Amino acid sequence: MGLKAYLEKIEPNFEAGGKYEKWYALYEAAATIFYTPGKVNKAGTHVRDSIDLKRIMIMVWAATFPAMFYGMYNIGQQAHNVILNGGASLPDMWQAALFTALGGQIGLESTGGLAMFLYGACFFLPIYAVTFIVGGFWEVLFASVRKHEVNEGFFVTSVLFALTLPATIPLWQVALGITFGVVIAKEVFGGTGRNFLNPALSGRAFLYFAYPAQISGDAIWTAADGFSGATWLSQAAAGNVTDWSLNADWWDAFFGNIQGSVGEVSSLAILLGGLFIIYMRIASWRIVLGVLLGGAVFSTLLNVIGSDTNAMFAMPWYWHVVTGGFAFGMFFMATDPVSASFTNSAKWAYGFLIGLMCVLIRVLNPAFPEGMMLAILFANLWAPLFDYFVAQSNIKRRMARVG
């Protein structure tokens, strides 16, 4: 018996009145991974396409793989470099013990890229697993109570949330963060398609304000004991970067040879995934370009104004793009179709506001050198208003046209 025939055979058990009716959400989620839903519209449709929401979400999920895989390698690379140079050692964490038990060695001249990748995987995969299991539990619970299908948007929420975290974050905080993002930022408003804030960023913001010591500072970015190292943005905010024309350092930041959150370090890897979802018309190029323009215009304005007391005024726009969460937020967070603006004209304003606010927070807020997370959440609140103004403008123009 084939898989499709087997699923069709057991389906009546999960439908209304069936033996396992309360588990319908789980059955539907599993079945539609392999096959499109069997339901049809009662009336004619405007667009007919074989793709559905699950396939769209899976494509976005797959688009994060370049940043994810490089991020795991970079975790190992950063730890290897500081241990090899002396003054640091393997951390007293079960992830490092697992790596050693698997036969891995790091911090040696003979250490290769595969060992670095394995070391990073020992840290990131548990984070992603906890995110998926805990967040998936809440998704299934709400779907079962409301008697509807499991929303596929969690495929994307889970991986985006995990990629914005440092490798050394405690797993119980990961569970709390994704719980806040799924339950408070999404499900209480009705679930996928009804939330007005980005769930992944809402969960990260909760962790930032509730447990700042484990998600910010200098000691969390490298998975090694006895080493503290600031991110590029933190160094710039402290006035430790005086020559922004260092091309070699910029390329290091672009390729991802720097410290940072797992999925935010390599602008090149992010660019590959971002261009894919733009090509597939899943992400809006207007929002991406708007974010880039907003950041470039405002940072250039601050460069012209200058400051004798704040070194961040001199930071060029092309450095803003490759440091912190700017690139990752621009491609994967700002383009969330639910919490972003919907109309084309509003997308430009929405994106521009994000880029402007990110640079504004980075430069003028000394307590928070990273600004993309707060900029996107702030713009989420403005997105409906931008759409409203565009809709009203279109209505007035059409009314004037018809007299």
Curated annotation (Swiss-Prot):
It is a multi-pass membrane protein. Its cofactor is FMN. The chain crosses the membrane at residues 56-76, 114-134, 165-185, 260-280, 287-307, 312-332, 348-368, 371-391. The keyword Phosphoprotein applies. GO terms for biological process: respiratory electron transport chain; sodium ion transport; transmembrane transport. It is found in: Cell inner membrane. It is an enzyme of class 7 (translocase). Its EC number is 7.2.1.1. Belongs to the NqrB/RnfD family. NQR complex catalyzes the reduction of ubiquinone-1 to ubiquinol by two successive reactions, coupled with the transport of Na(+) ions from the cytoplasm to the periplasm. NqrA to NqrE are probably involved in the second step, the conversion of ubisemiquinone to ubiquinol. This is Na(+)-translocating NADH-quinone reductase subunit B. It comes from Pseudoalteromonas atlantica (strain T6c / ATCC BAA-1087).
